[in-house]
From Swiss-Prot:
It comes from the Bacteria. It comes from Rickettsia bellii (strain RML369-C). Gene3D superfamilies: 3.30.470.10, D-amino Acid Aminotransferase, subunit A, domain 2. SUPFAM superfamilies: D-aminoacid aminotransferase-like PLP-dependent enzymes. The keyword Transferase applies. The modification N6-(pyridoxal phosphate)lysine is found at K154. This is Probable branched-chain-amino-acid aminotransferase. Pathway: Amino-acid biosynthesis; L-isoleucine biosynthesis; L-isoleucine from 2-oxobutanoate: step 4/4; Amino-acid biosynthesis; L-leucine biosynthesis; L-leucine from 3-methyl-2-oxobutanoate: step 4/4; Amino-acid biosynthesis; L-valine biosynthesis; L-valine from pyruvate: step 4/4. Its EC number is 2.6.1.42. It is an enzyme of class 2 (transferase). InterPro entries: Aminotrans_IV (IPR001544), Aminotrans_IV_CS (IPR018300), Aminotransferase-like (IPR036038), BCAT-like_C (IPR043132), BCAT-like_N (IPR043131), Class-IV_PLP-Dep_Aminotrnsfr (IPR050571). One of its GO terms (biological process) is isoleucine biosynthetic process. Its cofactor is pyridoxal 5'-phosphate. Pfam families: Aminotran_4.
Amino acid sequence: MTKNSENNLWYIWINGELVPYELATVHALTHSLHYSGSVFEGERAYNGKVFKLKEHTERLVKSAEVLGLKVPYNVEEIIKAHELLIEKNKIQDAYIRPLVWCGSESLNIINPKLSTNVLIAAVPSMPRAFAAGFNLYVSRWRKAAPNMMPVQSKSAAHYNMAITSKKEAKDLGYDDALLLDYEGYIAECTTTNIFFVKDNVLYTPIADRFLDGITRQTIIEIAKNLGLEVKEERLKLEQIEDFISCFATGTAIEVQNINSIDIGNKKVIFNDHKIADVLKEEYGKIVRG
């Protein structure tokens, strides 16, 4: 996609410049391309405003710092760059992708000459592919322990396993994979956080072994404001059969019903989506004003 609805060129913000879509390229020897040394965010703009932009931007900078990357712009400058990009591309509802990466000055693992670069891209929000809900299977791949990879950094390296797991799920006829942590407890889906419901109580894994999603945090806040109890616990795979409902949360999908999870010896079906639907509606009110 290279043009917007008014047939003007799309632009991507790169290191302080608005670059036409077709010219927004990187060198073949880009360090982060070879070593996954980049961090990014996934954001949504509604009616021309990015939801929780400050929180996303602060997390972007923090993610970079965890990897030892010094972002050459402060939070306020990155926020203003978002606003400039949205105005330039004349879009209201969009998916936003900020990225911080190392340049092509060296292929050494560590080199003080490596530059740190920033881009922000915005494309129109795509129609939701799983409006009717989706079906999961349990991936054979486990999340790395927090002392192996920094889980609160939204690093490209984390997504190697996510890609592998989701591809396997798709090949087997499922929509996505449920990931377990290094001890076998439920963690998350490949790119989203997961919630379960029983007796009007929300259960969700403790977010110390995976990225604590901003949408996840928002849904917990909404649920508590509605008077719902939320329990963050270590959840075992066999507990899935005890729940009546399941849903996933994420910037791109917002709140998405999960219809079933194949746990190996059986498929657990979820038919009661009433609480998820209420949370979905309330979330929509907040993000769309």
